[in-house]
Amino acid sequence: MNDIETVALVGNGNVAMVLGSAWQRQGIHFAAFCNRSATLPVGLERKDAQIISDPGQIPSDVDAILVAVTDDAILEVMKQLPSRPLVIHFSGCLPDPVQAGGVLWPIQSIVQNSKSMHNGFPIALSCSNSAHKAMTKFAKLIASELHELSEIERQTAHLAAVFAANFTNHCFAIAQELCQRAALPWNLFQPIARQIIEQAVEGTSKQRQTGPAIREDQSAIDAHLGLLAQRPEFEPIYTAMTKSIQSLHQATETP
């Protein structure tokens, strides 16, 4: 298989814009941009590229088609693509493409205008044997680290990332809202936030768990639930997290 030098990009969301711009800066030629609104993704240069809305109109002579759409749309888009080019998608949880191709999953939240995006970011690679050499070279153009994972390893890593990043960020968002409602300055909690992140980086989160849940301090738990009466949608989260902490540590202690 030839090196990936000319591509078509499907999608115009954050992944399309950030990864597309990164590859364009590395000299990759974009022959077509395809999305429902038939617009040029922000941050990319058109040059001589076609701008289309129908995936079936993508030129069949490109080296690869980059499918950077939502997970729910990937399989439907792939059904409409020309059969010849290599197909690459960026989902952490979907299967590898059936036809020759693979997955390049960025192990990082993709955010526009983030300085960290310009310094490269870790990427997980899973692909067919025939595409391995070309996709490895292509990924290394923008990756700070490249990790080869099987399909099930990548899907498990994506699940872990949701807990480590998405859910953690949501918990911080809840904490920040509670502080705002009580007129508490968020900088009070910056030291403990940094401590938690350091423990996570060290891989010692479980061993260093603290708080009323692990102590089974029911009076503190009840007091917290009482404070959540004004935001009842947070109560199931608090209760589920409390039970999860207790269950995880009880399972470890059971001989």
What kind of region is each of these model predictions?
Residues R194-P255:
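Interdomain hinge/lid region at the active-site interface
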Residues A64-N119:
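Glycine/small-residue-rich loop that forms an oxyanion/phosphate-binding "nest" at active or ligand-binding sites
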Residues M1-D54:
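NAD(P)+-binding Rossmann beta1-loop-alpha1 motif at the extreme N-terminus of oxidoreductases
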